[in-house]
Amino acid sequence: MSERRILVTSALPYANGPIHIGHMVEYIQTDIWVRFQRMRGHETYYVGADDTHGTPVMLRAEKEGITPRQLIERVWTEHKRDFDNFLVSFDNYYSTDSDENRELCERVYLKLKEAGLIDVREVEQFYDPVKEMFLPDRFIKGECPKCGAKDQYGDSCEVCGATYQPTDLKNPYSVVSGATPVRKSSEHYFFKLSDPRCETFLRDWVGDLAQPEATNKMREWLGDEGESTLSDWDISRDAPYFGFEIPGAPGKYFYVWLDAPVGYYASFKNLCGKLGLDFDAWVSTHSTAEQYHFIGKDILYFHTLFWPAMLQFSGHRTPTNVFAHGFLTVDGAKMSKSRGTFITAQSYIDTGLNPEWLRYYFAAKLNATMEDLDLNLDDFIARVNSDLVGKFVNIASRSAGFLVKRFEGRVNDAALANPLMVQLREAAPQIADLYEKREYSKALRTVMELADAVNAYVDTEKPWDLAKDEAQRDKLHAACSVALEAFRLLAVYLKPILPSTVARIEAFLNIEPLNWRAIDAQLSSARPIQPYSHLMTRVDKKQVDALLEANRQSLQATVDAVPAANGTPAVEPMAETIAIDDFAKIDLRVAKIVACQRVEGSNKLLQLTLDVGEGKTRNVFSGIQSAYAPEDLVGKLTVMVANLAPRKMKFGMSEGMVLAASAADEKAQPGLYILEPHAGAVPGMRVR
């Protein structure tokens, strides 16, 4: 097997919030693959960094009364702690706010400019006259230009699913200051992705992608041969902005989505300086090294269009492949702060749960596709307890004690030629291939089938019975030796997923650190094992319940900690006064939710079937998926606007509107709450 040179990255977490278990899916997926490559003997480097630039970081720092750099330094420490706790083995974890990143961003930009791929244009945007800043899409709210829903963001409507330009919003306001924004023009810098050179390159490059879903999506974005469907990419932002100023353009800054992926290279360049590696030999056009990016499917567009085109035309190698994964749900629903399933990495550790439990469970669910992954908490408990404790660790616990007490910890060398060893070793190529292809769930099914075979062997030999009869001493010695050698081989296969547990196994077995070549070795009587101590405890449901409660309490603490300037809860300004006749036009009715389901293709909408006492049901779409699991709403009473004209939406006809309460600034005061009448109310009652 020839040695490969491999550079691996995961997406960079944004430096204005904590790491949660949804993030951890990606870092665990990447780390398993990286650890496997290292075990195979390949020169592999895994780098990451905090994504530190942009308006949200600048505004959050201002809100906290600190500088952006003070904020990103604190968040970096928190993120690094979380990755260390979950055994994510970065070779270098850095920051996009670095000298290396500034230098590389300027180099890429100037090369693109030299190639004629940078254009300057006037762009009209919303401008906050109070904060004296241009407003990103997500910092503008207003009425949807399609359905009229209030408090919708500047790029899409959570009610009807429409997408639009911020300047299309009706009655817009700044989320930052509350002021009415004005339209203002400024010069912006664009990467000309629509250039025929980019299109030709991308059509060729798309054939290298490993995932059919990614290839199909890219071909959809590229359109048919001869079509011009690619849009140029705005790579600049106006001051004030926390980031890198564009060379030769005072007051203009690189958009965060330009400097963030370049941050992969900046982190690696920093590592190269520490290790004495030749950076250019890894990233130049003619490099023979491999380069892989693990990402979420929501940022596939940036990593399969902009990023490879930027690299290609700035004199760098392009990615060998981009691997995208799906989103995490918990118990079949989107992670929810109100249900306690929006679980932070730190809360998981603080509650006393073993990070390797989650590493194993995610691995048992992960494959090479972009399909979403569900953390079913009951299944999590059952699978960890069954597979890791009941099957894997149980092998050592049932045999090691006899070997230490009766045979000074020394195995019977001759017994290790047992046919069971052949079965375990013959599986190595298949397991290696599955790890390589990121088919972790299939790899673990194979490993657990082998564990079943080993446990069946132990059950047949019954060392606990053999130990009662001195005449069976040799048979006892052989049985325990075979069981522990099989356990060692299983440990090799599980090491990419359970690095901490396997490190303790290596110490207990008194062996060198396991790598893939160790499959061809075996335990030796010349190196006696150490006394056995427990390697892993079972998951207790009380721990999981405590974790959910801790995250519910964290939400409440966040809400309680957001006061207005006068010490009372912050609320948005009251609407203009209306006459009683205006209110009388609105027909509010009590409605019973008789059915509810998530809307395929939307991560915001739920589809509700409502009984409003008419003898028939109504279909209503509501943007409350982030707060409620469908099954939790069925049977509840709520309040709806019953005389709202039906409107055709992307996903079907909506025949009313369910009322829900939320704060004006949902990021500062998270939470979404449907109205629920007291007991005694019945469907069809009018709210007056």
Curated annotation (Swiss-Prot):
It is an enzyme of class 6 (ligase). It catalyses: tRNA(Met) + L-methionine + ATP = L-methionyl-tRNA(Met) + AMP + diphosphate. GO terms for biological process: methionyl-tRNA aminoacylation. One of its GO terms (molecular function) is ATP binding. GO terms for cellular component: cytosol. Keywords: Aminoacyl-tRNA synthetase, ATP-binding, Cytoplasm, Ligase, Metal-binding, Nucleotide-binding, Protein biosynthesis, RNA-binding, tRNA-binding, Zinc. Its cofactor is Zn(2+). Its EC number is 6.1.1.10. ATP binds at residue 337. Residues 582-688 form the tRNA-binding domain. A motif ('HIGH' region) lies at residues 13-23. Transmembrane segments: none annotated. Binds 1 zinc ion per subunit. A motif ('KMSKS' region) lies at residues 334-338. Zn(2+) binds at residues 144, 147, 157, 160. It is found in: Cytoplasm. It comes from the Bacteria. HAMAP family: Met_tRNA_synth_type1 (MF_00098). Belongs to the class-I aminoacyl-tRNA synthetase family. MetG type 1 subfamily. PANTHER family: METHIONINE--TRNA LIGASE, METHIONINE--TRNA LIGASE, CYTOPLASMIC. Homodimer. Is required not only for elongation of protein synthesis but also for the initiation of all mRNA translation through initiator tRNA(fMet) aminoacylation. This is Methionine--tRNA ligase. It comes from Ralstonia nicotianae (strain ATCC BAA-1114 / GMI1000). The gene is metG.
